[in-house]
A protein has these predicted regions:
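Basic, flexible Lys/Arg- and Gly-enriched helix-loop patches that mediate nucleic-acid binding at interfaces
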Residues: 1-236
Length: 236
């Protein structure tokens, strides 16, 4: 098994995050700085036979897999930065160890999935899987029906052409949009390219998972049914 995949299974983060840790030379394998190509040895019971450390602390195989939903408020940073007082890391429970699946901009709010399941994170994050995310957006002024049609058809900005998506009006200055892309600040840049400024952006759903009555700033474990539906949707 490749090192990055094993680290993800241990709940360190997604495979992408595991690769960043390896590139930053923060992972050691049997006392030596680890490389991406390093294999991990497992016994017949799938127990690791190697000594792996992150910043000098031993990495053990993952605790029980956990799945939480968080209603992020504006001002909370999704990056796990101990030195940043606005980081979500200061809001997470001590156990189980959780990390965000993807990100919401610091100036956006709404649904954020937290887990220690690296395989699930990989399938939700990788663009080839194209899972839907639903947002409610309020602009700085009322917009036309043509704006909604343009958003749904795809918008070109900075040599980027966004894919067609679903969009519908909610009010004179608010709309709902369902994306399967995950470009950086995509909705804000699409709106800006059409002459509008986003005043409020809230993620309200990730596939079938919704916020429901969860208060802003609160988090809770997913129900067994929610976990089952989520796993079925990503085929794990």
């Amino acid at each position: 098994m490749r090192l990055a995949k094993y680290l993800a299974q241990c709940g360190i983060g997604s495979r992408r995050e595991a690769c960043r840790l390896i590139e930053a030379r923060r992972i050691t394998l049997n006392g030596k700085i680890a490389k991406h190509t390093d294999p991990i040895r497992l016994d017949s019971s799938l127990n690791c036979l190697d000594s792996i450390e992150l910043d000098g602390a031993p990495i053990t195989q993952t605790e029980t897999l956990a799945y939480w939903i968080f209603n992020k408020a504006v001002g909370t940073d999704c990056r796990l930065l101990e030195q940043d007082e606005t980081s979500v890391i200061h809001l997470l429970p001590k156990a189980p160890r959780l990390y965000p699946v993807g990100r919401l901009d610091k100036d956006s709010r709404g649904l954020l999935l937290l887990t220690n399941n690296g395989e699930l994170t990989h399938k939700l994050m990788h663009p080839s899987f194209a899972h839907s995310k639903t947002y409610h957006v309020r602009l700085d002024r009322p917009f036309t029906d043509e704006f909604v049609e343009q958003m749904a058809s795809g918008v070109n900005y900075k040599d980027v052409q966004t894919l067609p998506c679903q969009a519908r009006r909610l009010s004179s200055d608010s709309f709902e949009i369902v994306l399967t892309q995950g470009l950086n600040r995509q909705i804000r840049r699409m709106s800006s390219a059409l002459g509008y400024k986003v005043i409020d952006l809230q993620r309200v759903a990730l596939m079938t998972l919704t916020l429901g009555s969860l208060a802003e700033g609160a988090m809770r474990p997913l129900t067994p049914q929610e976990v089952a539906v989520l796993k079925a949707a990503v085929t794990i």
